[in-house]
A protein has these predicted regions:
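Hydrophobic, small-residue-rich alpha-helical packing segments that form membrane-like cores
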Residues: 1-8
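Acidic, glycine-enriched catalytic cores built around paired aspartates
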Residues: 9-176
Length: 176
């Protein structure tokens, strides 16, 4: 949740950390993510967050078999994480990828911005939980996460970032 909070609150700095004349021209093109900073979590992780937010049980997602049209090959299960290459910030199974940066650019600036923003989010979480009695900690953490999801879920987008509909939706969400 700290990463989602950090990206939401510091999206402008994340964007600036990847800025160059060539990269600004590239962003939003067919081979690059759009310039609107959003996070792709995938269906499964998004469903987990929705379950937490709504205090509902999360049942493991059903595995979907890919139909590749060849019956002599083994069956493949669809990956529940990132297949969306239109997202500038994507969860890819066990990590987040920041994809706005050009291939020849240094990752130093984006790393400093992201690490500092996540550290700030974690510090704010700590401050909020500081002094909570041990027997109340689990409930306090649960409520903190629910509030954070509600406040920062606007930055989560699992769709196609190249569409005009996304630009309009991002504008409604205050991301653009």
């Amino acid at each position: 949740m700290a990463v989602i909070k950090a990206v939401d609150e510091y999206a402008d700095l994340m964007r600036v950390s990847a800025t160059s004349a060539g990269n600004d021209h590239r962003l939003g093109g067919n081979e690059a993510p759009p310039a609107i900073v959003s996070i792709f979590l995938g269906d499964e992780l998004t469903a987990v967050l929705e379950s937490i937010e709504n205090d509902t049980f999360f049942g493991k997602q059903k595995k979907v078999q890919l139909d590749i049209g060849a019956h002599v090959l083994p069956h493949f299960v669809k990956d529940t994480t990132d297949r969306n290459r239109t997202s500038p910030f994507a969860f890819t199974g066990n990590k987040f990828e920041f994809r706005m940066l050009g291939s020849a650019a240094s990752v130093a600036n984006p790393n400093v911005v992201l690490n500092t923003a996540v550290a700030e989010a974690l510090s704010q979480f700590y401050t909020e939980l500081e002094g909570t009695k041990p027997e109340d900690m689990e409930q306090a953490v649960h409520e903190l996460i629910k509030r954070a999801i509600r406040k920062h879920k606007k930055v989560i987008f699992n769709g196609n970032g190249y569409t005009d509909e996304w630009v309009a939706e991002a504008e409604k969400r205050g991301l653009y």
